[in-house]
């Protein structure tokens, strides 16, 4: 239940405008009223399925369950802020994309470049790749005396994350001794599974537990995301409150009043009836740029599944594409207006930006640019959104708009929960498990084999044979 007033919740409510998904707006490539009516029984079943599994979907309970750990989160954040000038996250997938997205959304867009007295919180680096040049570059720009690392892996065995941990731990022990690790290293992991929890206990590290039943791509509202957000100065209670408010909205059985179910329903109809196997997410705000990265993992990893039914292999999934308004008007929108009808475009518009910049009168004698003077960049970006929405619509391409009154912790919490609920409903509509990722395991096992992990000898032989076959077509 939201701690904010009813009036505030209504004022800051994230809304969806789906009118441009319909045939009456975009023509023959849009969704018809009949298609929606035909899908309503499936939508009702999807809603019932999600509600029945509510207790199993532990991520959905986070707005309530994580309140009890907030004192520990805030204490750790205060420690980091007092100790460090730099906060580094070692993680990959949801352990990285969520913290990046929230940090970008809620902090100064050039946060790391600000002088420390203006930043008021440590610089944030999220190391989500094992490119050796990148790791070497990070070590060139940080002062370990004033750096705290947070290693995040639920399994405690993620190769990319644990390799980075080995590098950082060796460096820290060499400089500060084993007793100094606690001042520079935080662990976020499972309460008992995997290798990291044992390391954390051995060295008495500050440790945060990822709750049972919360997968990486659904983990932003637990310590995976909350610690980094608190270090950055975010009001994490408002973030959770916003998510809880959206969960309430998505608990309505009426599809026309349930934003998550409506989004899922329209995307599935678009995919099944109109061949829209691509979904573009295009926020018109630099602050939301990396929400598209986080959403891409959520949507792709949850719905990209293979099932065998009646002897037939069925494949599901819609390919997410990241875009940014207005930047990608000059790189992608040509495709979205004149290209094939194989995609939906989801815009995110912002009612009020936190800053605005006036366009001054300078070249009033040049009519081709003088018309811009007297306006502001806020007016310009809003006009460009409306213009692009119009262009995509009149070209006959399905699109919709997620409307954020402004970008703050409460509205961002709503957006996170909205996308998570949309994904859960979509999984039920398709009849698939949206919470596993079996397709990822093959690559993990191959990596283990190539690096000599015991027990993967047969996989190594398989890889060698594949290499021989591949040589036949190398130019």
What are these regions (language model features)?
Residues 385-451:
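C-terminal helical cap and adjacent loop that interface with cofactors, partners, or active-site loops
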Residues 50, 72-85, 138-147, 266-277, ...:
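Glycine-rich phosphate/diphosphate-binding loops that line cofactor/substrate pockets in enzymes
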Residues 318-407:
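Helicase-primase coupling helices
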Residues 1-81, 361-367, 371, 459-475:
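Extended, charge-enriched "interface" segments that sit outside catalytic cores
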Residues 51-61, 117-122, 313-314:
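Gly-rich Lys/Arg/Thr-decorated short loops/hinges at beta-loop-alpha junctions or inter-strand turns
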Residues 78-254, 449:
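Glycine-rich phosphate-binding loops that contact phosphosugars or nucleotide phosphates
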Residues 174-346, 351-354, 439-475:
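Active-site phosphate/pyrophosphate-binding segments
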Residues 122, 206-213, 317, 369-373, ...:
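Short beta-alpha connecting loops at secondary-structure transitions
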């Amino acid at each position: 239940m939201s701690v904010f007033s009813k009036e505030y919740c209504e004022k800051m409510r994230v809304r969806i405008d789906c009118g441009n998904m319909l045939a009456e707006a975009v023509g023959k490539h849009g969704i018809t009223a009949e298609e929606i009516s035909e899908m309503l029984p499936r939508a009702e079943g999807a809603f019932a399925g999600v509600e029945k599994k509510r207790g199993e979907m532990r991520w959905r309970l986070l707005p309530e369950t994580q309140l009890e750990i907030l004192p520990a989160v805030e204490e750790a954040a205060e420690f980091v802020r007092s100790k460090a000038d730099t906060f580094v996250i070692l993680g990959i997938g949801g352990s990285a994309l969520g913290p990046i997205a929230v940090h970008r959304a809620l902090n100064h867009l050039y946060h790391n470049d600000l002088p420390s007295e203006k930043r008021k919180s440590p610089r944030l680096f999220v190391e989500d790749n094992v490119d050796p040049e990148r790791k070497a570059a990070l070590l060139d720009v940080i002062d370990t005396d004033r750096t705290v690392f947070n290693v995040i892996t639920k399994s405690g065995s993620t190769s990319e994350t644990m390799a980075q941990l080995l590098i950082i731990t060796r460096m820290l022990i060499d400089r500060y001794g084993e007793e100094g690790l606690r001042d520079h290293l935080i662990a976020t992991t499972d309460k008992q599974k995997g290798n990291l929890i044992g390391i954390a206990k051995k060295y008495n590290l500050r440790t945060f537990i990822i709750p049972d039943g919360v997968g990486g791509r659904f983990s932003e509202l637990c310590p995976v995301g909350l610690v980094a957000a608190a270090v950055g100065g975010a009001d994490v209670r408002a973030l959770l409150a916003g998510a809880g408010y959206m969960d309430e909205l998505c608990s309505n059985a009426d599809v026309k009043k349930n934003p998550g179910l409506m989004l899922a329903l329209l995307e599935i109809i678009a995919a099944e009836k109109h061949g829209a196997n691509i979904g573009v997410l295009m926020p018109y705000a630099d602050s939301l740029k990396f929400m598209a990265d986080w959403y891409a993992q959520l949507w792709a990893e949850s719905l990209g599944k293979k099932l065998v039914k009646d002897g037939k292999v069925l494949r599901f999934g819609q390919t997410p594409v990241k875009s940014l308004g207005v930047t990608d008007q000059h790189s992608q929108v040509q495709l979205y207006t004149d290209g094939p009808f194989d995609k939906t475009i989801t815009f995110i518009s912002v009612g009020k930006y936190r800053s605005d910049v006036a366009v001054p009168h300078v070249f009033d004698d040049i009519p081709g640019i003088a018309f811009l003077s007297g306006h502001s960049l806020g007016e310009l970006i809003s006009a460009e959104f409306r213009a692009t929405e119009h262009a995509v619509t009149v070209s006959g391409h399905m699109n919709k708009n997620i409307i954020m009154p402004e970008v703050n912790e409460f509205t961002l919490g709503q957006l996170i929960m909205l996308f998570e609920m949309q994904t859960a409903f979509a999984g039920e509509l398709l009849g698939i498990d949206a919470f596993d990722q079996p397709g990822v395991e093959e690559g993990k096992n191959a990596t283990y084999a190539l690096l000599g992990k015991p027990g993967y000898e047969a996989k190594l032989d398989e890889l060698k044979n594949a290499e021989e076959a591949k040589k036949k077509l190398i130019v």
